[in-house]
Amino acid sequence: MKLKKYNYLFCALILSSFNITAGVIETNFIYIGESSHPSLLGVKQGLDESNLQGEFLNQKYSLDEITIDNIDGHDFSKYLAVLTSVNSKELRNIAKQLSETPVFNLADESDELRHDCTKNILHITPSKQMKSDALMQLKVKKPDSNATAKSWHHTFVKFAARDLNKRFKKNYHVKMDDHSWAGWAAVKMTSDAVARTQITKSSDMLEYLKNELTFDGQKGSNMNFRKNGQLRQLILLVENDKVITEAPVRGVAKPPTLDSLGILDCKN
């Protein structure tokens, strides 16, 4: 996979935003889940782009992969962040074992997980409530719409999304979907944080992501995490396999508009 020709100019333009260090910073990720899950392709896309950027910034990124059946006894000490495509029960168990490490949820939409407010689970994928709220907002303006709510879609073109979709399709010969975008976003927001801060400890990265993150994600808004760990983000509304608009829906959502979607509070 060669991203270099396409992206050297892009990397040169963003160098001024990051700190360049003399020594090489090596960052390790681990993915826990099935190899067939589409989030893994997004993770790999993010890793490729991060390593391309890292050539200019003296940073290297690597990825290990295991299934949920192989986590017992695995040494997680070297990983800056954990990327998962597992169910709610498995995700809770992983987060409990790795309480000072960012554990990214790339797949589970459970509202209960957001109510739990587990301190180290970071939900990239939107909750069911976020999608439901987005559709309810659309119904106010378009009562007859049969749209579905997505976090990503292969026809999305705004905010440089077209370029991301093209890069992904070229590399993996499939269309980027919700899960593959989530995998890409988790890696990219972490590597961008490393570029800006040179963080090497997982506990420091968790603190940064929860409290200082601003991430575009090719969605045109500065995304960050709620106290319950959910990533604030636009929701794409898709009808007939095309993006027709985004939520929060203008003229319907009340400010702060991104918080008009989904769960804000913890149960306890």
Question: Residue ranges of each PLM-predicted region?
Answer:
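Extracytosolic ligand-binding ectodomains
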Residues: K2-L3, Y8, T21-N268
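N-terminal signal peptide c-region/cleavage motif recognized by signal peptidases
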Residues: S17-N19
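Hydrophobic helical h-region of N-terminal Sec-dependent signal peptides
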Residues: F10-C11, L15
